[in-house]
Amino acid sequence: MYSEIYFMIPLILLIALTLDIVIGWPEKIYENIGHPVTWIGKVISYFEHSLNKREYSKKSLKLLGVLTFFLTVFPITAVAFLIEQMLLSFYYGFVIQALLIWPFLATKSLYTHVKDVADALDKKDLIASRAALSRIVGRDLKNSDENTICGGAIESLSENTSDGIIAPLFWAFLF
């Protein structure tokens, strides 16, 4: 049974990637429940604001950082592992696994956001290109010129290809 699932991994990843490329993360779903990556970010942010205090020693901060890691990663990993184990007994469990991997991919979203920047730059519209880039970077773009905006879009594309496509596929492949 367990060996059979390993032959299904490429199919599971292909289904998840295809869903993301074709559908992305639908706006209606995002409006109603948000996005799993956003949920995890909120958990991390909560721990950061609760535990990362200037008055704590470096040793305490490191210990609290490790605690944050385990309180964030362990429950998510445990739940994912339990779900995967339950799905192994279902004939079409691989489809459900693909549906569970799909939200962690950002292929269509990344393409759309970077294309919005490129389209605005093609029209020589710095205001629109700054606005489009501000949706994918966290820096101040008030005085950004065309080269800075283009560089920011390329940098974001590179980083987010790793974070939003390669890493989720890699970890899904391993686990």
Model features per residue range: what roles?
Residues 1-175:
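Hydrophobic alpha-helical transmembrane segments
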